[in-house]
Amino acid sequence: MSVVKIPLVKKKSLRQNLIENGKLKEFMRTHKYNLGSKYIREAATLVSEQPLQNYLDTEYFGTIGIGTPAQDFTVIFDTGSSNLWVPSIYCSSEACTNHNRFNPQDSSTYEATSETLSITYGTGSMTGILGYDTVQVGGISDTNQIFGLSETEPGSFLYYAPFDGILGLAYPSISSSGATPVFDNIWDQGLVSQDLFSVYLSSNEESGSVVIFGDIDSSYYSGSLNWVPVSVEGYWQITVDSITMNGESIACSDGCQAIVDTGTSLLAGPTTAISNIQSYIGASEDSSGEVVISCSSIDSLPDIVFTINGVQYPVPPSAYILQSNGICSSGFEGMDISTSSGDLWILGDVFIRQYFTVFDRGNNQIGLAPVA
């Protein structure tokens, strides 16, 4: 049994790379930016909707190795999806040529299957094949892990993506093609001592962020963990009691559903509610479609408070206003994701940077505590 610590590195996001290459406007024009379609899934189909635009602002990445000897890949550890996939040598899309590509012929432990994988994005689909191989993650060997080898990847914009692939950490029920997720396979093999993993995201430093499989490291948080039951086992979905600013309800007055998603960088919610919040904090759209705010307002704005399972989780303006190159932008994003349990909110990295998060599969609960 070992504790598996995977360091995450904070790098420039896809959005920042697009801006620096003068490609953001073209991207926004050609990719109707629908963050929500990652979460809209027909349970009956095996096609999962997961637009890559969701990963536009993601900044935290980890390295895994696949095969024997290991071939290294930079991936997003994403609690909002469940598949592992990386580019393969069978992919000649422009995006693949600029990234590490898995070569099955170079691995002595690779096992092919005849199964295919298709993950639909907002603008096309990532199609590929499923294979089995050993995945090296945080110093342990996850053997016989099923994963996707991409053959086509949508959109040349992925050429600029700072990651090769995605490692999904949500429940098996939302895995495309019914593929066993990495954490499930690791737990089933008895490679970690507890059926849980935890995440710490550092605010500023490039290093320091970490995903820990099978353990809770109390040095990352202060006080004690508060536990919240998972309301629907698919995403890491929980019930939020209320969302307030200055003691006034600004959204979710009758309770709402939220998912805790490391693969989404912002705080997202229904467009009407979010536009109320944007006007409340004085944020507005500039000519390029960015929602900007005066940097001087960071000192005067109130916390936004999420009450979850009776406990208040304040997120201060220094967290929900993002500063980059002297420009301040809102960390709130509107999207409409209606589910049978109502409209979904997404507590992304803006929230997780404030709260050390434990994803407890064994007890179907999430633990939250302020970061140390």
From Swiss-Prot:
UniProt key word Cytoplasm: no
Biological role stated in the UniProt entry: Shows particularly broad specificity; although bonds involving phenylalanine and leucine are preferred, many others are also cleaved to some extent.
Keywords noted in UniProt: Aspartyl protease, Digestion, Disulfide bond, Hydrolase, Phosphoprotein, Protease, Secreted, Zymogen
GO MF, one example: aspartic-type endopeptidase activity
Residues modified to Phosphoserine: 114
GO cellular component: extracellular region
Major localisation: secreted
Protein name: Pepsin A
UniProt superkingdom: Eukaryota
Compartments where located: Secreted
Organism of provenance: Bos taurus (Bovine)
S-S bridge residues: 91-96, 252-256, 295-328
One Pfam family recorded for the sequence: A1_Propeptide
Stored PANTHER family: BETA-SITE APP-CLEAVING ENZYME, ISOFORM A-RELATED, PEPSIN A-3-RELATED
Gene Ontology biological-process entries: digestion; proteolysis
Active site: 78, 261
Similarity section: Belongs to the peptidase A1 family.
Gene3D superfamilies in the cross-refs: 6.10.140.60, Acid Proteases
EC class (word): hydrolase
Catalytic activity: Preferential cleavage: hydrophobic, preferably aromatic, residues in P1 and P1' positions. Cleaves 1-Phe-|-Val-2, 4-Gln-|-His-5, 13-Glu-|-Ala-14, 14-Ala-|-Leu-15, 15-Leu-|-Tyr-16, 16-Tyr-|-Leu-17, 23-Gly-|-Phe-24, 24-Phe-|-Phe-25 and 25-Phe-|-Tyr-26 bonds in the B chain of insulin
EC number: 3.4.23.1
Propeptide: 1-42
